[in-house]
Amino acid sequence: MVLSAADKTNVKGVFSKIGGHAEEYGAETLERMFIAYPQTKTYFPHFDLQHGSAQIKAHGKKVAAALVEAVNHIDDIAGALSKLSDLHAQKLRVDPVNFKFLGHCFLVVVAIHHPAALTPEVHASLDKFMCAVGAVLTAKYR
């Protein structure tokens, strides 16, 4: 998925608004994903999946950090997330569809907290970005 210059600007703009809330939004994204797509819980059998659990917050922080890393290296997402791609493909063996679920839930969280920022154009750019992140994380499955 190729991000245009406008897409990159839109994505960076959204993440600048997210600012210090990235970890909170990461946890909220996971909670939403576990409720909307309960099959995703199978990868977290050892987690307390209750609202506000320390484990969800900690993993949400990791998710947020990976997304921020991807934004910071938006011209080389594959390089920025290479180790994470290896982990998910070779060790964790996460079903690739789960990255789509995560991306969708992240878009919902952004829409809830920043409805004015999520214009149709920004929505499309953020969706393309999340698809690009998902593609990178599943690229080494082959």
UniProtKB/Swiss-Prot annotation:
PROSITE patterns in the record: GLOBIN
Gene3D superfamilies: Globins
Gene Ontology molecular function terms on file: haptoglobin binding; heme binding; iron ion binding; organic acid binding; oxygen binding; oxygen carrier activity; peroxidase activity
Claim: Iron is one of the keywords in the record: yes
A GO cellular-component term linked to this record: haptoglobin-hemoglobin complex
Binding annotation for heme b: H88
Record carries keyword Ligase: no
Binding site for O2: H59
Domain named Globin: residues: 2-142
One GO BP annotation of this record: hydrogen peroxide catabolic process
The entry's keywords: Heme, Iron, Metal-binding, Oxygen transport, Transport
Cross-referenced InterPro entries: Globin (IPR000971), Globin-like_sf (IPR009050), Globin/Proto (IPR012292), Hemoglobin_a-typ (IPR002338), Hemoglobin_oxygen_transport (IPR050056), Hemoglobin_pi (IPR002339)
Subunit relationships: Heterotetramer of two alpha chains and two beta chains.
Record's function text: Involved in oxygen transport from the lung to the various peripheral tissues.
Family according to the record: Belongs to the globin family.
The name this protein goes by in its record: Hemoglobin subunit alpha-A
Organism name: Cairina moschata
